[in-house]
Amino acid sequence: MSRNILFISVQTIKDRTGLHNNVDDKLINPEILTAQDMYILPALGTGLYERLQTGIQDQDLTNDEATLLDTYITPCLVYFVMSELPMGLSYQFYNKGMIRKTGEGQENPSASDMIDVADRYKSRAEFYKQRLVKYLKEKSGTNIFPLYNLSLIHI
C-alpha cells in the first residue's frame, strides 16, 4: 500500500543524473512514487517496504535499513524514475487533452529517441535492482531484515 512516502527526493535524482534543476518537482514526484510501487515494492516485499516507509516517516531507520536505502535502493530507484520520465515530461494532460511540450529553438526528440533514453536508464536500474536483491538474499540468513525473510514465504 502506497502511503506517499518517497524513498528518495527529487534533488537526489537531479544530483545523480543529468536532469536539469529547472524541471518542476511536481512532475517528478509522481514518477518516484510510481517507480517505488512498480519496481522497488516487488523487490523488497510488502513487509520491508512498509517498514522503510514507516522508518522514514518516523525518522527511526536502523543503520542497516539506512544502508539498504542509501546504498542499494537509491541508485536503483533513481534510474527507474529516469526511465519513466521521458514520456512523463514530454506529454502532459491539460483541460483540452494531452499535448506534447515543445520549446522554441530546440530540436524535439522523436518517440523512438525517448524510448531509447528510457531503455538506457531502465538497463541501469535493472543492474542496481539485481544488486539490491542479491544483497537482500545474502542477508536473508541473518536477522538484519526479518521482514524481507517473511515476505519470501509469501512469494
Residue ranges and their predicted role:
Residues M1-T74, G88-K96, R100-I153:
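Conserved short "hinge" loops at termini or chain/domain junctions
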Residues E84-L85:
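Ordered, amphipathic secondary-structure segments that act as subunit-interaction surfaces
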